[in-house]
């Protein structure tokens, strides 16, 4: 599933084609994706102009001049193909590039714009979805109401992290992946941020808060590294594993800078560390970390 940097990369690729453009026609080639389309979905989109294309965690939101916002979630394999007015093509979020995945038979939604551009949503697995909600109700809608703080926003700082994690015995990695606390973090970038911070993924999350609720020293370090990892990943166009490419069709490059993710047995890249990267399973997901410089304190 694409994480925050990949979704932000898709947003940046779609924005030039969509923002300021009027939706002329919407074609639905099936009645549903993961969920049924909203009532009168195509009718409510047609004739509207896209004022802004934003991102909330791992969701895209297109704010329309009708007072509604289109919410888009890519699921596991969602991608967009864009045909620009000049006839050129982009693939902002080109997932599953080989075989049947990503072929035209999985083109489920086609949006034609008055400027001649066409945006096609393709989703082989159909885990993605689209919804329409009143823009004024966006933050309280069912998709976002319980969502936590944005990790790249100024709202996430060491005191906020300490308040979120205070007295929690949940493993630190699980707490970071809890979208009700911090929205948008995924497995890859949590593993990377924890390694840079020198924190064991199984450390109780509450260890980042002092008894009085103020941040422990490592809380500031972790916040800094979360923001650094995400910022670097966005700049690199996301991470390509087997299914992701940048808006221009090129592969994302951040995977070349992975320190621990999917690097079991490799030497730890931390200067002076002689350890190797290990793997454990937490919550059904692989966790990668250095067995030497990310030590779980003995209690």
Curated annotation (Swiss-Prot):
Pfam families with a match to the protein in the record: Fapy_DNA_glyco (PF01149), H2TH (PF06831)
Cofactor: Zn(2+)
Superkingdom as given in the UniProt entry: Bacteria
EC number: 3.2.2.23, 4.2.99.18
Chain residues that bind DNA: 106, 125, 168
Keyword Methyltransferase recorded: no
Annotated catalytic residues: 2 (schiff-base intermediate with dna), 3 (proton donor), 58 (proton donor), 285 (proton donor)
Free-text remark on how the cofactor is bound: Binds 1 zinc ion per subunit.
GO molecular function: 8-oxo-7,8-dihydroguanine DNA N-glycosylase activity; class I DNA-(apurinic or apyrimidinic site) endonuclease activity; damaged DNA binding; zinc ion binding
Zn finger spans (FPG-type): 259-295
Known catalytic reactions: Hydrolysis of DNA containing ring-opened 7-methylguanine residues, releasing 2,6-diamino-4-hydroxy-5-(N-methyl)formamidopyrimidine; 2'-deoxyribonucleotide-(2'-deoxyribose 5'-phosphate)-2'-deoxyribonucleotide-DNA = a 3'-end 2'-deoxyribonucleotide-(2,3-dehydro-2,3-deoxyribose 5'-phosphate)-DNA + a 5'-end 5'-phospho-2'-deoxyribonucleoside-DNA + H(+)
Positions of transmembrane segments: none
CDD domains per record: EcFpg-like_N
GO biological process, one term: base-excision repair
Keywords: DNA damage, DNA repair, DNA-binding, Glycosidase, Hydrolase, Lyase, Metal-binding, Multifunctional enzyme, Zinc, Zinc-finger
Subunit structure: Monomer.
Family: Belongs to the FPG family.
Function description: Involved in base excision repair of DNA damaged by oxidation or by mutagenic agents. Acts as a DNA glycosylase that recognizes and removes damaged bases. Has a preference for oxidized purines, such as 7,8-dihydro-8-oxoguanine (8-oxoG). Has AP (apurinic/apyrimidinic) lyase activity and introduces nicks in the DNA strand. Cleaves the DNA backbone by beta-delta elimination to generate a single-strand break at the site of the removed base with both 3'- and 5'-phosphates.
Entries under HAMAP family matching the protein: Fapy_DNA_glycosyl (MF_00103)
Protein name according to UniProt: Formamidopyrimidine-DNA glycosylase
Species: Methylorubrum extorquens (strain PA1) (Methylobacterium extorquens)
Taxonomic path: Bacteria, Pseudomonadati, Pseudomonadota, Alphaproteobacteria, Hyphomicrobiales
Gene that produces this protein: mutM
